[in-house]
Amino acid sequence: MKKFISLILAISFIFAAPTMCFAESGTNSLAENKEEASSTQPDFGFSVRGALLMEARTGAVIFAENEYFAASPASVTKIMTLLLVCEALEEGRFSLSDKVTISSHAASMGGSQVFLEEGEQMSVEELIKCTVIASANDAAVALAELTAGSESAFVGMMNKRASELGLKSTAFENATGLDDTVTDHYSCAMDIAVMSRELIGHDIILKYSSLWQDTIRDGSFTLTNTNRLVRYYEGCNGLKTGSTDKAGYCVSTTAVRGDMQLIAVIMGAESRDERNAAARALLDYGFASYGLYKAEESFVENIPVVGGTCYQLPVYSTPFVTLVDRGGLSRVEQVYDIPESLSTPLAAGERVGQVKYMLDGQELGCSELIVKEECPRITLLQIFLRALSLIFCGKIL
């Protein structure tokens, strides 16, 4: 009888919820920094049609002025052209080494070009290089024809992709941005920044957009970057310029310093110098005023498990990154929402809590607390066997 009672008590002990308490919520304050950052957007006095500064990793907008004003983007159009080509490469529809035979239509393109001739053959990688560095219209059309069969079919892909990206003030009529005959070809600073952010995720783009000069045709033809900031601005690694009488001077400029990549878009400047000065001013402001707050994946603590085959599981926080004014980087606090115990069954990767990141009482965002191991619910047979081992061995085996 005594052993029967002991068995019942042992089972109750095994299945009961643990009473030990872990911090339900807490803060992990970083060093105090009394410097306050201004929330007022600066007035640069730009005389441009639109301007925007975005941090690439988070997509956070730092500065915006007439960011949805739709206008001709000129050759900045090729950001979408190159994006579709890169995505086709990823899908395996062709390779960088594939040779492309230039059509009469591609060879007929005016404006910026590398003077491709009908019937000439050039590799996909060389055509990308020509488009990225020299803004070559003939190379861009050759890539469009390779990707979709014709430039007109490619334009359909461009507009479809714009819709998928949620671009509200963008429409295309060609793959180049030549705008002397188009009537419905436009974009805005915000949409161009979104496209740019997608494009720089493809390594081959920054490989070439960061170069001041390169060559094609066995070194006999020199390509010079249309983006002078690549040569003269610290950290500039792209991306695309454009200018026509209708568009004025446009650019989507990317630059990286440390762990932060910025995208500065200028639409409709009156001169090349004004365009470059405006882009520089935005980039200078962004690098001087903002930084990335990052929390890497980390172990938090072991949490007891109720009714599972395991007794506790380690809990981890997922990575988190956000843009913060430099004056606030040292004041970000982590507030943990951690359960006292975990209920089964638990799957690997399951969310069990969260970490909130706070700055001066404002929530910046949150990351998840997860378990990396699964833990099934314990069966009655397993409970019984554990109880027996506790009674007869003095411990659970």
Language model segments and positions:
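Generic solvent-exposed, charged/amphipathic alpha-helical segments
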Residues: A10, N159, L283-F287
